[in-house]
């Protein structure tokens, strides 16, 4: 691989200097302009000879061993004209001798470093052979005979080099050293750049180094090439490092080690001319001639005096100021900037240390309080001016232009404009003619009357007019959006006004919002004004009164907003119901609405329903299967007057509650506990408000009742006047009147609409008009018909219900027995020798604690059988019996055995304790009432009428 030069490469002196500055490299051989002259006396490694592949390099050659004795002074750099325009410099490294040559020693190879430099247009090409480093020994000898042909290289432009620079041909006069400014008041920190700029010296080695190590050295060393001033005569080659005289110590205090001058790059700058400013070394600003960080390309000046010199001159260099040209210097700017910041901080500290006279401090505090009050009053005035300009824009620009268009061309109705701007004209007149002039006059007379409370107190009541505007705001914004899409002319006028400078690039809706925000702004400013007023100010009383009036106006606006929101909610509900109910009324308020589950009165299944609670009524709605329009249909309307709320605690039906009203009773179930809590709280608060309203107007329930129509022996005066709570059909196994067991074919179940009991068809043959159902005729049982209308004279069914009939000992209603019981719950039971388990409702009454009653359902009026408990022993089943249910225990007496299986282990423990004490004949003492939640599968539901059950019917007493 042959060494080649890039077109426009530099003269031979440039690579020579680069090689001289490389650690461990020997100086380059530099010949005169004569191409055939070899420089004697240069040290080389073993062997001598000429370069292969062409004639000897006219400027850089590998000298023979015989030339080592020549004195160093005989080495002269070539001279020639110097170009002044240089652009960029690139290095390339090539290996020669890559092909085997016969008869030559193949152990050593030549590393060629070619240097290219862009010359000016006036330079002529100068062919030149490959350059060889002085540290490379070169070929041993030249063998006579035919030479091997050189390697072919890629076609390209012919390598050219410029002639030698003039400063290398004649000696140059070094400029005097530049003056150094005096040192700062305090010592400077150590310059971190000195340590990094110095490269440790390495002795020249006669042994050949590896090619890779040489390449790494050249790549690490930045070479800076710059034009210099032309100087006549040749430039002598610098002597060996050991022969250089030691430079005197520099004023900055940094000492260069011995022999390091030839290995460092120096930045030489001419001294200051007349009238020029001496450069400041502490400025921290790098020179424009600082070397580039790139290792292959360095930019130099196009014209003017040279800035850099690569030739570390002879002893004259020691007397010049030097600077290390390390491109990776640590932040010198940061060091200098830190010094400047510290000086500024010292000056600020000195200023703070200046004491302030105490009288001046006291006066400044007093002025600050007065200024704060004045600034708040002035802020009120300035914001009022800006606000009046916005009102002028709304009333005199937007509204006026739209009204003109509506009246002249009828592009849109004028009522639309009035609906949008409402009473903005009155608001504008109030602020523009009254409030703003008063504030301006007062601020002009602030020195004599420093107060604004009296003005606001006088005019604050008129701020209530904002309530109408605020209430209409949502509708106004909706009208603007609607007619902007519907009417082109409406849209054009709005956009034209919005483009004006007075509009401030804001939309009409933004300006319409400002009156809504103005009253809260008055309130905030006045509160701040009161806080800043000094104690005992004469304006405190008026300002406090003004704040109360403004707060009243704000509350008036808030009330208008709430009223408007309520009306919107009513309209939405009205649309949900398809206009079926007349609910849009100023006195009606929507409290709560939402989905909920309703438990069926027949079998207890859940059904999805929708409840809407108002302040005077509860609407019970069912969903409609329609995609558009009406979504719900009203099934029942329950008045709040006479409504009762009962919370249920059934374990199998959690989150349930009972709403009982005059028109209907509903057993409802929420999906979550939080939902149940919200509904119960909303209904209770509605009932409480309704009672307070009745007390306020002194409306008594007794005045609206017709007690004369009710028989005196009626067990319940509300029979027929309010809807009963129906009992579920599966909670009853027999007719609650005749006690006949039900049958799905011959004995079907029916509900009495007056009391809610489950009766058979024979016991519900009568019909009566009920007040709660708008006096419509409904099926009622015999007892309710007698209570409402008296006993019929000739009724066949009446003879079957004679009151003189003797009652059985088992005719004890289960719900009444459970109300006053020791323990009761559902149990699975089996007698000894039985074929399977049966489920029944077991009750131990409080008045008969030694008897166990067995019912078919919790609402049966007659027990199926009873079992005396004295003498029974309670215990777990025997090992050989192995029942197929969990939590099994048994009671035994002689040859009689009963097996019981409760649902939970806790319930098993309680039953065993109660039955064990009853079997021993122990008497029970009254104990605390325990909830039936853990053992009851279904809660007995109270029935209104003759057998109405109190709310605590779902609780039992465990006297263990």
Swiss-Prot record:
It is found in: Cytoplasm; Cell projection, Lamellipodium; Cell projection, Ruffle; Cytoplasm, Cytoskeleton. Residues 335-350 have a biased composition (Acidic residues). Residues 589-688, 820-920 form the PH domain. Residues 285-294 have a biased composition (Low complexity). The modification Phosphoserine is found at residues 48, 205, 714. GO terms for biological process: actin cytoskeleton organization; cytoskeleton organization; filopodium assembly; regulation of cell shape. Zn(2+) 1 binds at residues 735, 738, 760, 763. Residues 125-135, 273-284 have a biased composition (Basic and acidic residues). Pfam families: FYVE, PH, RhoGEF. InterPro entries: DBL_dom_sf, DH_dom, FGD1-4_PH2, FGD1_PH1, FYVE_RhoGEF_PH, PH-like_dom_sf, PH_domain, Znf_FYVE. Interacts with DBNL/ABP1 and CTTN. Binds CDC42. May interact with CCPG1. This is FYVE, RhoGEF and PH domain-containing protein 1. It comes from Mus musculus. The gene is Fgd1.
